[in-house]
Design a protein with these regions (language model features):
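Conserved pre-motif C helix in the palm subdomain of viral-like polymerases
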Residues: 270-276, 689-712
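A common structural junction motif
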Residues: 585, 750-760
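Entry/capping segment at the start of metal-dependent catalytic domains
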Residues: 1-15
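A short acidic-Thr-Gly-centered motif at the start of a beta-strand
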Residues: 1, 44-48, 465-481, 713-718
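Active-site palm subdomain of RNA-directed nucleic acid polymerases
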Residues: 282-294, 703-733
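Function-dense linear segments that define catalytic or interfacial modules
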Residues: 441-536
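Active-site-proximal helix-loop-helix substrate-binding element of RNase H-like nuclease domains
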Residues: 12-16, 20, 24-279, 283, ...
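Conserved "right-hand" nucleotidyltransferase catalytic core of DNA-directed polymerases
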Residues: 7, 132-191, 204, 212-465, ...
Length: 777
């Protein structure tokens, strides 16, 4: 077993130092650039062939650099030479190294990923907690009280300059950007670190004042190379004689830094020391879990990259540039966007252009507005929403008659969205063209549900599904043929397995589309067949697509508000649709209610407006495959907010000050209590949604990872030619494959899916062989 870490020139340049040790052996520092090439190659051979495997912290990063280094050095004709004496030659060979052999260790354990499966999941990025509209007179006292009542670990703020800075008092501005003097927001801004040293300080008890952090020993900014994660080689940035400050221009500085700076060398040695100690702290976990194996796979696959059609990408970029140039305004400016929308909005409609008490034209707002229609006042009830008997009007919804004619603001919102999408597309195409390949990079556990997430400046999961785009991604080259497919109705079959509703299962087995089933309730009185018939119609007329948006919102924990914004229907109709759905599929409704009940810590047994009581919530939710999403931190904060709202300090209640908060005149302490309760309920609601989301998304992540890992098992251990090169995007697995291995890959796919059928009865993958492009699947 080898404990491994590397130091590099920048984030994406070649390794400068390899630190390693056996289970009980002395820590070794191998200086790459001043050592004969053969010695480095021999070390890599030893690491790859170790019979137990490797243990590291963030192996996707380290293994990428081992592969990058090996494939560059192995091409050099004289292995007795030192790399530092042949910088230009090696920089030229580096690019070609992407087409070299595959490196795969015997086994692996990534302790960063292991930590993310337990309570240290809390070190992953998370949203701020806000207490909104607190009277200014009490704002700083409330912040101080929250600091005192909620003891939070420094690791949750490790990326801040001042880790002790927790709850902050923030100004609130009105629609004109002016500060509202009477109220403040109190915000808990997390800046957690899952870095090795931060975890070592918290788990192993090292003094944060004496532990060496990278910022303590790193070279100054002017010594860092020009680089990019999506084009991770020097020739993407420069050429011999003009390297444009990419790594060939600074490698000597980095070599000398890691060779002669004793503090830097101690820092590097500590990396292995802490990794080994964490291995023991976590109870010597077994090597070979799927996530750790995939971390090494992600690193080596990222370095190789995937084939793209450069001419096709150039054509797409030209079209996007032309579309952007044709836009009537500069939609890069939020002020321009807001003004453009307000021109066709009335005073009430303009209230939608805000987010968290600030003016905003963020995408989620524009997506909602893009669904607006030109509704008219109901002539039957004159806009009252009820008849003379007080009964709900059967001709309208809340006094308005819906239409399929887009609102003027809807058209403008969609135009702004199109502009932003075109801008993002151009950025993507520029990145791909710079590299000449698609260097897909992932965080193996990138979200709290364990899903993979894009990394290093290019998000593979953001690439459009459009055929014209995916035709430009042949993906396979160098003698490999593209295979791949995606899971059919993935989220739906997972929901069927998770909730186990026999009525829904019976409908799905007959081939009925869940989007059509739900669409009947979203767009009454339309029938199932009428919903399906709208598929492909323009704009809001496509009720099938809008129903599909509603289904995904439903699957991921959304209720009436989310359904309303995602589908573009009034909240009352969304609520009625949700209630009709869970009344028809009662087991679904009961199982969903169980999840919500697990995290419903604050309850009003006697109804809205009555006393709120506290019930201890669950600390985690578990997927059908056993991956836990922890809510320990959120529950801790929520409970303190509740307790403080229930029983604030007495001197707050004695303050004789009245304020008007959300159209209600309250005492200052009463307004504080309202703000605290609102924050606690918002946090609770977020937990409930995340829990409902988790049982679907985490299960999907486990399945796609399992299939990737099983395909990757076909790649030989050690250093060898490429046989398979898996890539996971959402519910798709694409895999350039050596021709003779295609039947073996197909067999693995079939065995994996059939093995999961007992847990996920409707699981199915539509797999194809010898595909021309990503669009062919």
């Amino acid at each position: 077993m080898i404990f491994l870490d590397v130091e590099t020139c920048g984030f994406h340049g070649p390794a400068t130092l390899i630190q390693w040790a056996t289970l009980d052996g002395e820590i070794q520092l191998h200086d790459v650039w001043c050592t004969p090439i053969q010695e480095t190659l021999d070390l890599i051979y030893m690491i790859v062939d170790d019979e137990e495997g490797i243990v590291g912290f963030n192996l996707a990063f380290d293994w990428f650099h081992i592969c990058q280094l090996y494939t560059m050095l192995v091409q050099f004709p004289d292995p007795n030479e030192r790399p530092i004496d042949h910088i230009d030659e090696l920089a030229i060979l580096e690019e070609q190294g992407r087409f070299g052999d595959c490196l795969k260790p015997v086994s692996a354990l990534d302790l960063m990923l292991h930590a993310r499966k337990g309570p240290y999941q809390g070190t992953m990025n998370r949203s701020d907690v806000k207490v909104k509209k607190v009277p200014t007179a009490l704002a700083w006292e409330v912040a101080k009280e929250l600091d005192a009542r909620i003891p939070l670990k420094d690791v949750y703020f490790a990326r801040k300059q001042d880790v002790k800075k927790r709850w902050q008092v923030m100004d609130i501005t009105d629609d004109f950007g002016d500060i509202i003097p009477d109220f403040k927001n109190i915000v808990l801004k997390f800046a957690p670190s899952s870095a090795l040293k931060a975890l070592a300080a918290d788990a192993l008890g090292y003094d944060t004042e004496t532990i060496r952090m990278f910022t303590d020993i790193e070279l100054p900014t002017q010594c860092q190379p020009t680089e990019s994660g999506y084009a991770p080689f020097a020739l993407a940035h420069g050429k011999p004689g003009d390297w444009n400050w990419s790594w060939p221009d600074v490698i000597r500085i980095h070599m000398e830094h890691w060779l002669f700076n004793e503090s830097a060398r101690k820092y590097a040695s500590d990396d292995v020391k802490y990794t080994r100690e964490l291995y023991h702290y976590f109870g010597k976990p077994a090597l070979g879990d799927n996530d750790s194996i995939l971390a090494c796979m992600v690193g080596t696959v990222r370095w190789r990259g995937f084939a793209i059609d450069v001419d096709g990408i150039l054509k797409l970029k030209k079209q996007a540039v032309e579309a952007l140039a044709a836009m009537p305004h500069n939609f890069n400016s939020p002020v321009v966007c807001r003004t453009y929308l307000e021109q066709v909005m009335d005073e009430t409609e303009r209230l939608n252009l805000s987010y968290q008490d600030r003016p905003s034209t963020r995408s989620i707002i524009l997506e909602d507005i893009a669904n607006w229609t030109e509704d008219t006042v109901c002539p039957e009830c004159k806009g009252m929403g009820e008849n003379d008997l007080g009964e709900e009007c059967s001709h309208c919804s809340g006094g308005l008659v819906k239409s399929d004619i887009p609102h003027k603001a809807a058209r403008r919102a969609q135009l702004i969205l199109d502009c932003r999408h075109a801008k993002k597309e151009i950025e993507l195409y520029d990145k791909l063209l710079k590299a000449g390949r698609f260097h897909a990079s992932f965080k193996v556990i990138g979200t709290l549900s364990s899903r993979m997430a894009g990394a290093d400046g290019l998000n593979p999961q953001g690439i459009k599904h459009a055929t014209t785009v995916r035709e430009c991604f042949p993906l396979a080259d160098c003698g490999l043929s593209l295979c791949g497919g995606d899971f059919a109705g993935f989220e739906v079959c997972l929901a069927d397995a998770v909730y186990g509703d026999p009525d829904l299962h019976a409908d799905l087995v007959t081939g009925k589309k869940i989007h059509g089933l739900f669409g009947q309730y979203l767009f009454p009185p339309m029938t199932y067949d009428e919903i399906l018939a709208t598929k492909g119609l323009p704009d809001n007329e496509d009720k099938y697509a809008r129903s599909k948006n509603g289904v995904f919102a439903l699957l991921y924990g959304g209720q009436e508000y989310t359904l309303s914004t995602r589908v573009g229907i009034p909240e009352e109709i969304a609520n009625e649709a949700y209630q009709r759905w869970i009344n028809k599929y009662k087991v679904w409704g009961k199982e969903r209610a169980k999840i919500f009940d697990m995290f419903c810590s604050m309850r009003q047994p006697s109804g809205i407006g009555t006393k709120v009581t506290w019930a201890e919530p669950s600390n985690f939710i578990e997927s059908m495959f056993g991956f836990k999403r922890y809510f320990t931190l959120e529950n801790q904060i929520c409970k303190v907010l509740f307790k403080l709202a229930e029983d604030p300090p007495k001197h707050w209640t004695r303050m004789h000050l009245k304020v008007t908060r959300r159209d209600r005149v309250q005492t200052a302490s009463g307004a504080v209590r309202s703000a605290l309760f609102a924050s606690a309920f918002a946090l609770q609601a977020a937990n409930m949604r995340a829990a409902a989301n988790h049982v679907i998304q985490s299960s999907g992540a486990t399945i796609t990872k399992l299939l990737q890992k099983n395909i990757w098992d076909l790649q030989p251990i050690g250093i060898s030619e490429w046989l398979v090169q898996p890539l996971n995007i959402h519910d798709e697995i694409m895999c350039p494959t050596k021709l003779e291995m295609i039947p073996e890959v197909r067999k693995i796919v079939d065995l994996t899916v059939s093995g999961l059928i007992p847990k996920v009865p409707l699981l199915e993958i539509e797999w194809g062989d010898k595909l021309e492009t990503w669009a062919s699947k």
